[in-house]
Structures are given as structure tokens and as C-alpha cells.
Amino acid sequence: MARYRHSRSRSRSRYRRRRRRRSRYRSRRRRYRGRRRRRSRRGRRRRGYSCRRYSRRRRRRY
């Protein structure tokens, strides 16, 4: 009985953690995407650095 209870609590905690992590990552990604689009447009006009290279570096990190 003790063994069953332990495994059950373990699986439940893992599921909860995974769910929370996933939602947080999704929200952060969406916010980052919107901010990046606005910033890249403004930066391209002001500075003359290549946007393609910058985006590639960011993508690799994610």
C-alpha cells in the first residue's frame, strides 16, 4: 500500500509540473515574438545590421 501511494503522488507531481512549465513557456514565447517583431522593424530602419543574422542567432538559442 505504501509503495502504491508513493508512486501515485510522484506521478501526479510530475504531471502538474510539466503542465505548468508548458503553459509558462507558451505565454513567454508569444510575448517575446510580439516584442521582437516590433523591435526588429524599428532597429532595421535605424541601424544597418542584418536582421536575418540576428534572427538566426535567436532561433538557435530557443
From Swiss-Prot:
InterPro entries named in the record: Protamine_P1 (IPR000221)
Gene Ontology, cellular component aspect: nucleosome; nucleus
Alphabetic keyword roster: Chromosome, Developmental protein, Differentiation, DNA condensation, DNA-binding, Nucleosome core, Nucleus, Spermatogenesis
Residue numbers spanned by region Disordered: 1-62
Subcellular location(s) per record: Nucleus; Chromosome
Superkingdom of this protein's organism: Eukaryota
GO molecular function: DNA binding
GO BP, one annotated term: chromosome condensation
PROSITE patterns: PROTAMINE_P1 (PS00048)
Tissues in which the protein is found: Testis.
Broad class of where this protein is predominantly found: nucleus
Known role: Protamines substitute for histones in the chromatin of sperm during the haploid phase of spermatogenesis. They compact sperm DNA into a highly condensed, stable and inactive complex.
Similarity comment text for this entry: Belongs to the protamine P1 family.
Protein known as: Sperm protamine P1
Taxonomic source organism: Thylogale stigmatica (Red-legged pademelon)
Origin organism lineage: Eukaryota, Metazoa, Chordata, Craniata, Vertebrata
